[in-house]
A protein has these predicted regions:
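Pyridoxal 5′-phosphate
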Residues: 1-148
Length: 148
């Protein structure tokens, strides 16, 4: 055993590294697919739901931050969760309160208070984006009618 006892090697980490290395040849293809999906999400959510895109145009295509002014993030989160759609509010740096990152980007409170963070992975499809857009449009109708 060359001086090592069994259990010394971090087998889960080794297997994770193996998987990452095996996936390297597909990285550029996956990145291009993510960019296309991210752009589709931007266009779809803006045109169908009136979403304001907070993410810069040159952001990495794995996270999209949007706002639906007039609707609080937490209210939208619960509405989406009830439909098995899971996103986050604000930014990863500000769980539970207004995001200083979004404020530093120059966003007004109306946008930071309604911000949603959408994360993408290689398994997401345009259909997933369409379902999200449908749910956000429904949320706007229901919440407007309920005066929330």
């Amino acid at each position: 055993e060359n001086g090592m006892r069994s259990g010394t090697e971090p087998v889960p980490l080794i297997m994770g590294l193996k998987g990452a290395v095996e996936d390297l040849p597909n990285l550029n293809t996956q990145l291009e697919k993510q960019k296309q999906l991210w752009n589709y999400a931007r266009e779809t959510l803006m045109s169908r739901c009136g979403a304001v895109i907070n993410s810069p145009d040159d952001a990495l295509p794995y996270i999209l931050n949007i706002s639906l002014p007039g609707y609080r993030s937490e209210t939208l989160l619960h509405f989406l969760e009830a439909r098995n759609i899971f996103v986050s509010s604000g930014s990863a740096c500000a769980k539970g309160h207004g995001s200083y990152v979004l404020k530093e980007m120059g966003l007004k409170p109306a946008l930071t208070d309604s911000a949603l963070r959408i994360s993408f992975c290689k398994n997401n499809t345009e259909n997933d984006i369409d379902l999200l857009a449908d749910a956000l449009c429904d949320a706007e109708k229901v919440l407007r009618k309920a005066n929330i």
